[in-house]
């Protein structure tokens, strides 16, 4: 009786949980090979294409930025809603519009999905630089390139909100590629 192996491999981006490479195939048929040998041969036959998809995905991240998502919430005790007007540089606009513009000014791309509401804002498909420059706290005048992630990006937005309006906010992570900014205090 001939034996063969069907298999499926799916590689996921740890930041977005999106599939970046899939390989489904059947291995060669054999009367005498062990299951381990059949599996090894089946995977080896498809590995070059699978790894090429990984490399293309990584090149895309380097060129276009790493994808993250943000979630904005407001504490119930916070006196403002995200669709309330605020003044910024002599202009009145909804707080959510200002957030959208600020994200666009610091993201690698300005093409992201923005879904505002009065109590929450969901932002997805934001592209950020893979690395950012950060001051070395132990060596004066020295800066290092460090990995960037959703929390560091959200921290920057949180500091902007506090500096411009005095609104406190709390940043929490939801995995590597997603962060929540809760505005106001309890």
How would you label these PLM feature ranges?
Residues 1-10, 17, 158, 166-168, ...:
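A short, hydrophobic beta-strand-centered structural micro-motif
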Residues 1-2, 11, 24-29:
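Short N-terminal edge-element motif at the start of the domain
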Residues 2-7, 63-67, 121-123, 176:
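Extracytoplasmic
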Residues 18-110, 149-159, 175, 183:
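C-terminal/domain-edge helix-coil "capping" segments
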Residues 106-173, 184:
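C-terminal soluble interaction/assembly domains
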């Amino acid at each position: 009786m001939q034996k063969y192996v069907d298999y499926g491999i799916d590689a996921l981006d740890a930041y977005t949980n999106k599939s970046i490479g899939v390989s489904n195939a059947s291995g060669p048929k054999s009367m005498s090979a062990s299951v381990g040998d059949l599996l090894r041969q089946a995977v080896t036959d498809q590995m070059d294409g699978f790894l090429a998809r990984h490399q293309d995905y990584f090149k895309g991240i380097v060129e276009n930025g790493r994808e993250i998502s943000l979630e904005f919430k407001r504490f119930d005790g916070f006196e403002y809603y995200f669709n309330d007007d605020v003044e910024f540089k002599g202009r009145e606009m909804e707080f959510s519009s200002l957030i959208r513009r600020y994200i666009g000014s610091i993201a690698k791309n300005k093409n992201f999905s923005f879904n505002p509401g009065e109590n929450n804002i969901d932002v997805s498909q934001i592209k950020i630089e893979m690395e950012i420059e950060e001051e070395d706290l132990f060596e004066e005048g020295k800066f290092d390139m460090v990995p960037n992630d959703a929390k560091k990006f959200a921290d920057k937005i949180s500091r902007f909100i506090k500096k411009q309006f005095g609104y406190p906010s709390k940043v929490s992570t939801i995995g590597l590629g997603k962060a929540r900014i809760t505005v106001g205090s309890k």
